[in-house]
Amino acid sequence: MSKYAWMYRLGIRPWERYGTAAAVGIAALIDREERERSRPLGRALDLGCGRGQYTPELERRGWQAVGIDNVPSVVAEAADRDTSGASYVVGDVTDLPAADVGTFDFFLDIGCFQGLDAGQQAAEGAGVTALANPGATLLMLAFGPTRMRSLLEGVSMKAVERAFPLWDLVSVDPAQTRGLGWPMNRSRPQWYRLRRTPPA
């Protein structure tokens, strides 16, 4: 059983706490994505969707939303709870082409990438790149590196750039920490926005 499967079984879901605490800020960032696009918005992939905290909102906003996670019971729960019409797939973010989910215009990663080792991060980056339509964007939340690696996973900006070499880093914005509590409020979380680099 994977680490995340155990955490879900034990009811340890700190990433959901962040989503609740930062809901307004997350909505504003997705608003920004949508202002730069014409309708229809296109397809969106929620990487490491868990119990579907964000996937339904993407669907309600007008995206054709798909959530992907490698914990089958959690994907089933997300699908059962969803009333938006979004789709859910059991799959591995480090082997996205194998999930056979098609291509996408927007990728959302809230805390998934940071839980992977360097090799897995590179694999996620390669998979996202393979599934990205021209002009696709990626919005990623990741905690910064800390001395508390055993308690709180985190990544550096260099790690993000290394995993997505064919993407332009458009912006890096500090994420709010209010309401998170220790140790997450010491982690310097950042929002990374990337855009697929046009072919030469």
Where are these regions (language model features)?
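Short catalytic micro-motifs in class I SAM-dependent methyltransferases
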Residues: 111, 115
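A conserved beta-strand element that flanks and buttresses the S-adenosyl-L-methionine
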Residues: 108
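Class I (Rossmann-like) S-adenosyl-L-methionine-dependent methyltransferase catalytic domain
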Residues: 1-47, 51-100, 116-131, 136-200
